[in-house]
Amino acid sequence: MASDDRPLALTLGDPSGIGPEIALAAWQLRSERGVPPFQLIGDPEFLEATAYRLGLSVPVAEVEPDDACEVFPRALPVLPLPSGAKVIATPGAPDSANAGAIVESITAAVDLVRSGAASAVVTNPIAKFVLTRVGFAHPGHTEFLAALAAREGREPSLPVMMIWSDTLAVVPVTIHVALRRVPELLTQDLVERTARIVHADLRARFGLEHPRLVLSGLNPHAGESGTMGTEDRDVLAPAVAVLRSEGIDIRGPLPADTLFHERARATYDVALTPTHDQALIPVKTLAFDEGVNVTLGLPFVRTSPDHGTAFDIAGKGLAKPDSLIAALRLAHRLAHRPADTVLPFPARA
């Protein structure tokens, strides 16, 4: 199969959330919104029943990996789970009985990309509490994908989560951890490793020859010379100095409260922040329906919509597919970017 003919591999996500219905809606909008070919890995009968329940005119076709692109114009291609597992789910009622199918879908998507049968992984939202009830040991998608990438003797990768939109791109240095643990986890080494991965992937994946990074402070006023906390002075500033000595264009630590207004955003490509919410609050405020989660540092392309399972609206026909469509389109562009082109970045658009 030629590389340009490979479909995207879309995971099932939590079947009690909005993942299945936004996948159906994305297929419906394939022509209008320029959605690239994708195959969903799950249970064809469940997707068919979901379409019927929502009143969506979406034909579903069970496929083999090589058939997806040919089928995509006329039906939503669904690749059954390798185990043949069936999915039974009620919208808005998460059930740990589906945990095995959720995890299997993610693993199968990665395997398709690693085998060359798919061009990139796009993941539908999962609920961590559903999986942890059955012993899932990873804080989230990002960390699990890093573990999958480390199989077969590969060097474990540091999972780096970038939220990308047409308005702003951000990277939290610490991800799915309690806020009280951030000061102990926020080491100079972690900041340096994260920034190096961001710098390398912006060059390799997006084609930015000279990425511009900025690092926000952890404390108010970036610590104000240690009077409001010492992490900015003792951890973040030394990391920036080392990175700059390596030729990486990075500034900081800068006060987080003045980092995201329009003029400031024009001065950098990606903002790194010490905590999860420092990054996600501004990007979700500015681009709630269009944000895309991109995992950096993996040997394959992975994106996902920048929202959760939305159990409260699942099955009600209220979920918007915009973020999933953006994730599908960006994954396709990243996987098929010609070597001599640069993908548009918010501050350079």
UniProtKB/Swiss-Prot annotation:
EC category name: oxidoreductase
Compartments, as annotated in UniProt: Cytoplasm
CC cofactor: Zn(2+); Mg(2+); Co(2+)
Gene3D superfamilies named among the record's database cross-references: Isopropylmalate Dehydrogenase
Residues holding a divalent metal cation: H176, H221, H276
Domain of life: Bacteria
GO molecular function annotations of the record: 4-hydroxythreonine-4-phosphate dehydrogenase activity; cobalt ion binding; magnesium ion binding; NAD binding; zinc ion binding
Amino acids binding substrate: H141, T142, K284, N293, R302
Biological pathway: Cofactor biosynthesis; pyridoxine 5'-phosphate biosynthesis; pyridoxine 5'-phosphate from D-erythrose 4-phosphate: step 4/5
Residue stretches in coiled coil: none
Main location class: cytoplasm
Pfam families recorded: PdxA
Cofactor note: Binds 1 divalent metal cation per subunit. Can use ions such as Zn(2+), Mg(2+) or Co(2+).
E.C. number: 1.1.1.262
GO cellular component, one term: cytoplasm
GO biological process: pyridoxal phosphate biosynthetic process; pyridoxine biosynthetic process
InterPro entries assigned: PdxA (IPR037510), PdxA_fam (IPR005255)
Catalytic activity of the protein: 4-(phosphooxy)-L-threonine + NAD(+) = 3-amino-2-oxopropyl phosphate + CO2 + NADH
Subunit structure: Homodimer.
Family, per entry: Belongs to the PdxA family.
Miscellaneous field: The active site is located at the dimer interface.
Function as written in the Swiss-Prot or TrEMBL entry: Catalyzes the NAD(P)-dependent oxidation of 4-(phosphooxy)-L-threonine (HTP) into 2-amino-3-oxo-4-(phosphooxy)butyric acid which spontaneously decarboxylates to form 3-amino-2-oxopropyl phosphate (AHAP).
Name of this chain's protein: 4-hydroxythreonine-4-phosphate dehydrogenase
Gene field: pdxA
